[in-house]
């Protein structure tokens, strides 16, 4: 994760954060014409949650960039053929006009600013593309909405991920964002739900007493979740919001 400081429990992040649905690979191929000649920069790659979907799109090369060295180490162990580099969105360690696509999974809100967009513009080839992807909770489910409200309370307010992105486009040499939406589901155990909350940077930073209070409140929410008898497995619906934009000449 790049920009403002992102810190999390890597084990919780790996275990509890949802993977991206297979439709993302199809979207990469269809929306961006990814093929065997494409070079893709995965910016803010973290531990490589998005990486398998990029690999499945069969590009020529994938370069993963992140400031969080420990996360990149996890990615490299999982995907040894990916070129991992330490760097930030404001100082991408790549040559000018060297990549066909910059893909950002679950991270653009950390560096949604003019400086980062100028740097992304620099490394993209002419008519290169930008992909912004987020997995979000389906707040139409009452207990999930309560979890989201608990998270916002701990954060001190909503994250406003999409609003930050929308304010920048069109502009800075990029076209208006085009949105696509995908749905999927993941089964979580009760322990997984606690680990999911721990994976958020704002929760990870809380003092021990406040974190314990948060988990106690989460336990009360969990009691309201409908589920089959003699199981601690719950269905967690996931919405994946994906945006595309194209680099255009700046007058």
Swiss-Prot record:
One of its GO terms (biological process) is cellular detoxification. Belongs to the methyltransferase superfamily. It comes from Schizosaccharomyces pombe (strain 972 / ATCC 24843). Pfam families: Methyltransf_11. InterPro entries: Diverse_substrate_MTase (IPR051052), Methyltransf_11 (IPR013216), SAM-dependent_MTases_sf (IPR029063). GO terms for cellular component: cytosol; nucleus. CDD domains: AdoMet_MTases. One of its GO terms (molecular function) is trans-aconitate 3-methyltransferase activity. Keywords: Cytoplasm, Methyltransferase, Nucleus, Transferase. Probable methyltransferase. This is Uncharacterized methyltransferase C25B8.09. Its EC number is 2.1.1.-. It is found in: Cytoplasm; Nucleus. The keyword Kinase does not apply.
